[in-house]
Each structure stands twice: as C-alpha cells, then as structure tokens.
Amino acid sequence: MAESFVRLEHVFYKYEDTEKYAVKDVSISAQKGEWVALVGHNGSGKSTIAKLLNGLLFPEDGLIKIGHFVLSEKNIWEIRRQVGMVFQNPDNQFVGATVQDDVAFGLENHGVPHDTMVERVESALNEVGMQSYALHEPARLSGGQKQRVAIAGVLALQPDVIILDEATSMLDPRGRAEVMETIRIMREQEDITVISITHDLDEVLFADRVIVMNKGEIHSEGTPKEIFQQADAMREIGLGVPFIIELQEKLVAGGFETGSTVLSEGALLDQLWKLNSNN
C-alpha cells in the first residue's frame, strides 16, 4: 500500500483559554487523490484539524506530515504551498475587483510570472465553469458561484491538498450541489487529495472515506456506506443520517423489501424496481 500523503499521528491540541483538548490523540491518513470527510458537531474538533493541517495552528503533541514535509516552523511555507483552503463564507475570501483579479491574487503573492499567471487563471476558471464570469464583480455572483471562484483561486496555486472547511454550509441546495460537483470533477482531473470538514451528512456521501469526530476524538471511521449502516450509533452522538438512509429505514419499517443499503435515490429506485419485478 502506498504511503499516506496526509498523515496525523497521535495529535493533541488545546486552545489557550481552556484545559479541555479540542483534539485528543487523533491519527488520520489520506492517500494521494483520496476524498476524506470529517464530520461532527460544533466543538467536535473537525475545524481545529483543518487549521492544524494548514499550519494555522501547531499541535501540542504528535506529528503532522504533508507529502515529504513534517509540520514545523521551518517547513511551514512548504506545507502551505501544498495545501489550499476554501472557507465557510465566500465573501470573506475576495480581494480582487473582478473574478480574474481575485483568482490571480494568490499567484501574485507567490511571484508567479505574468504569462504563467494568465494561463493558470484561465485554466482554473475553466475547470470550475466560471470563465465566462472572468470580468464580473465577485459581489454580483451567487453563493455557489462565489465558492467556485474561491476554489479556482486555490486550484490556480496547484496544491496537492484542498481543505474544504464547511465550504457549503452557507449555500442554498443549488449552490451546494454546484460546489460538490465542481470538487468531484476537479479531483478526477487533478488527482488532488480532498479533506472536507462538514456537518452536512448528504455532502459526506461524496467522500471515499468518512471520519466521525466526537468531543475531540475519532468516534468511527469507514466508507460512507459503512458509517451510515451504523445509523443508531450516529444518532447516539446526535448526528443522524442522510435523507436517503432515512428513506430506506422508513420503507423497511413499512414492510417494503429494499435490499442492501444504497447511497443515491437512483440506486434505490433501481433496486426497488428489480425487487418488485422479481415478485
């Protein structure tokens, strides 16, 4: 098995104003190109992990490694060159007068030559489907469009890892779907590792692997299907399950045979059709 590209080993962290650990003995790994979702309530430690991964915070104990670099004061800029972050509120991320200016901002800070910058901005906007908005003012975009531009700004820097820190929590369902589809396509094309920090259980279904956080510790880990087959355990910590899982539970409770657990409405319809056709 290939060595993990992102690795946390026995990481501890607590904020200065509290004695309680925000992250307690957490070990997480992610392969190159893998999508890992961290899910949990507010205060579960998931957003603290996002800040630790980008070097915004340093662990009190334990090791964090991105690629070939261990997080330290010496390697902080090497880490940040490899890790891009998309935050919760897109309005807090814009600094340019136009969409293309905003995407170019990070490249300017990195001293990227102008010709290369133009190519990267165009490529990144094309990748997120926003090239036709290049000269628009960011303030005039919808929430979903703003987050796609924020993702383009990160993509232009060509990171190995993108962290989505509650990146869809302020969006309506349409905007959320736009952003998730953008991330899905981006990961397939660029082989980027995605770490999504979320409390949106439907968003978790896009991930290859899910890590459930509770009170600063890892509660459970597995594929989305494995995690949501443990519906009662999720409810015990107050998280619940996605709508598609609830629907299957209600069908079973009503006496319908649904077969194995599936994670999309289309797959459920196909399964119900096949079962009904055989009766």
From Swiss-Prot:
What EC number(s) does this enzyme carry?
7.-.-.-
Enzyme class, broadest EC rank = translocase
Output the SUPFAM superfamilies linked to this UniProt entry.
P-loop containing nucleoside triphosphate hydrolases
Query: Which residues belong to any copy of the ABC transporter domain?
Result: 6-240
CDD domains named among the record's database cross-references: ABC_cobalt_CbiO_domain1
Which of UniProt's keywords are assigned here? ATP-binding, Cell membrane, Membrane, Nucleotide-binding, Translocase, Transport
Q: Please name every pair of cysteines joined by a disulfide bond in this record.
A: none
Keyword field contains ATP-binding: yes
UniProt-annotated location(s)? Cell membrane
Q: Which Gene3D superfamilies match?
A: P-loop containing nucleotide triphosphate hydrolases
One cellular component term from this protein's GO annotations in UniProt: ATP-binding cassette (ABC) transporter complex
What topology in the membrane does the UniProt record assign?
Answer: Peripheral membrane protein
**GO molecular function annotation:** ATP binding; ATP hydrolysis activity; ATPase-coupled transmembrane transporter activity
Where, by residue number, does ATP bind? G40, H41, N42, G43, S44, G45, K46, S47
Q: Outline what the protein does.
A: ATP-binding (A) component of a common energy-coupling factor (ECF) ABC-transporter complex. Unlike classic ABC transporters this ECF transporter provides the energy necessary to transport a number of different substrates.
Quaternary assembly: Forms a stable energy-coupling factor (ECF) transporter complex composed of 2 membrane-embedded substrate-binding proteins (S component), 2 ATP-binding proteins (A component) and 2 transmembrane proteins (T component).
Family, per the entry? Belongs to the ABC transporter superfamily. Energy-coupling factor EcfA family.
The protein depicted here goes by the name Energy-coupling factor transporter ATP-binding protein EcfA1
The source organism is: Listeria monocytogenes serovar 1/2a (strain ATCC BAA-679 / EGD-e)
